[in-house]
Amino acid sequence: MKREAFIKVVEEALDSLPEEFRSRIRNVAVLVEDLPPHQSPPQAGQPRKLLLGLFHGVPTTKKSVFDLPRGPDHVVLYQKNIEAVCSTEAEIREQIRRTVIHELGHYFGMDENQLKDV
C-alpha cells in the first residue's frame, strides 16, 4: 500500500473513534514509519513477532504537574510490519484500527492485560 493510502486509513481509524476519545487525544500525534529502528525488513516465511506500533510518552494516569517538559506524546505505526502480518487490504485496514486503539490504550494508562479485553 502506498504511504498516502496507508495514512488515509490511519486517519479513518482515528475519525471512527467516539468523540469522547477523539477530544482527549488531540495532542497525541500519530506517525507512520516503515520499520522500528534497528529492525531489518520482514522476510516472507519467517514467522516472528513484529512490532506493529509503539506509544511514546507518559500515560495520562502517570502525568503530573511536576513533570519536566518533554516532546509531545505520540504513537508510531510501522507500515511494513503491519503489511507483513496481513494478506489483504481489508486485513490491513482492520490491523491499523486495532493497532491505533491498542497504542492509544497505552496513552490512557492501560497495560497489556487490560488491552486484551478491548
Model region roles, listed by residue range:
Residues 1-95, 107, 111-116:
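Active-site rim/adjacent substrate-binding subdomains
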